């Protein structure tokens, strides 16, 4: 959660950092899709997926290693029985699942709309992808934990909507900057 407050609202109850970083992944995917097509965009997603899951799993294993040093549990036992290590593992699986499903859906929606007005494909695909990402991630990571995951999901999605709007102009600039020699047809 984001620690702090804005206009008297406690942001920790409604917002996570992923709301700000995740839309940048859509910017990269949509720009790659526009310039090079669906195949290269899918490859970018797979690399991002592997990198993100690996980093989170390393963090989970790091927590488990600290717990297992006490001698009471093995590394694998600590990973599944220590609440902090298991939460990180659950977050890794939720994040990876949500990222992969949402980004691949984003690529397909973008491709269907690629011949429309320049902003429709990135706006619609990011909107649909962000919704799916938010739904999958927060449900898998936090459902049944007693944490305020529904309010985090709502705040996260609203922040993603703002970020989608803010990133449309950089999308247009990147596409114009790199367009002619690299661009795939339409």
Question: What do these predicted ranges mean?
Answer:
Residues 61-88:
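Membrane-interface interhelical connector segments
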Residues 114-131, 182:
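Internal alpha-helical transmembrane segments of multi-pass membrane proteins
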Residues 82-100, 109-112, 116, 144-152, ...:
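Membrane-embedded alpha-helical bundles of multi-pass transporters/translocases
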Residues 112, 125-126, 137-143:
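A structural feature that tracks compact, well-ordered secondary-structure segments
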Residues 26, 30, 52, 56, ...:
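Transmembrane alpha-helical segments of multi-pass membrane transport proteins and ion-pumping complexes
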Residues 1-46, 53:
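Hydrophobic transmembrane alpha-helices
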Residues 40-45, 118, 122, 149-153:
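Alpha-helical transmembrane segments and their helix-entry boundary regions
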Residues 49, 96, 123-131, 153-160:
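Transmembrane helix-bundle signature of multi-pass membrane transporters/permeases
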């Amino acid at each position: 959660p984001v620690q702090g407050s804005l206009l008297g609202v406690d942001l920790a109850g409604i917002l996570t950092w992923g709301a700000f970083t995740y839309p940048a992944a859509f910017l990269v995917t949509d720009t790659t899709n526009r310039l090079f097509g669906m195949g290269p965009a899918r490859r970018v997603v797979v690399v991002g997926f592997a990198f993100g899951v690996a980093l989170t799993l390393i963090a989970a294993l790091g927590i488990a290693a600290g717990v297992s040093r006490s001698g009471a549990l093995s590394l694998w036992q600590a990973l599944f029985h220590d609440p902090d290590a298991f939460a990180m593992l659950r977050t890794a699986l939720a994040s990876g699942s949500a990222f992969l499903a949402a980004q691949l859906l984003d690529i397909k929606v973008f491709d269907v709309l690629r011949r429309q007005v320049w902003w429709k494909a990135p706006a619609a695909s990011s909107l649909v992808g962000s919704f799916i990402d938010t739904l999958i991630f927060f449900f898998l990571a936090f459902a049944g934990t007693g944490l305020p995951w529904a309010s985090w999901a709502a705040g996260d999605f609203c922040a993603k909507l703002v970020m989608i709007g803010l990133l449309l102009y950089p999308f247009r600039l990147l596409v114009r900057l790199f367009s002619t020699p690299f661009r795939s047809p339409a």
